[in-house]
Amino acid sequence: IKKYSDHIPHPITLTGTDGESAVVNSAEALWTKSPKDVSDDAYTQFYQSNSGNFDTPFITIHNKSEGSLEFTNLLFIPNQAPFDLFEPERKTKLQLYINRVFITSDLGDLLPQWLRFVRGIIDTPNLDLNVSREILQNSPTLAKIKKAITKKVISELEKKLKKDPENYDAFWQSFGRVMKEGLYEDHDNRDRLLKISRLYSHKQDKFITLQDYVDQMAENQKSIYYLASENLTSAKRSPHLEGFAENGI
């Protein structure tokens, strides 16, 4: 009952052998409330309960989409990287609900793999409760939801980078390696993802965006120069940097 029906809009009562009755589900779903009616503490408690993490969310994304495709998402981008971030399966772990009834958290593809650190729920009335796993994995409805929430997550990260670059840099240190997977794998979102990627600048000795680099290029510089390395320490020690540094690049 707790796993599958805790959030349905009807209380479930269990009567014991002594004749005493008790409601055994919460009969509430936080995501059905208006965001303005939900406190930060309530979001944090739900995030921690839902994800098993102990940090506070870096970004909370709570909205409802209506029309031909109806769904509600309550998503959380963590502050700290989860322990399983680099497991070989690279599974995403969003929970799927249909009309507030829990269906599964093991689909693995409600988000692209490079966003596998995102936690939370998707609730939609546009699927049947008795739908099979095979149908879910090939569902056009879920494909549309995936596309919509991926764009929403990127949009929120764009806003965060613009408004709070210092904390975004801390986020990038935790999740940048994973997000860069999307530059290779996610052709639809590659350009937007590149714009919010942080790259280390030897000249400025800090992480910047590609646009920052272009804006500060020397007047006679026609090319963008980059060095690939296993880590930042190795890159800084590369002898290839000396000539560029001497020329102010």
Regions found by a protein language model. Name each.
Residues 2-249:
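Conserved GHKL (Bergerat-fold) ATPase module
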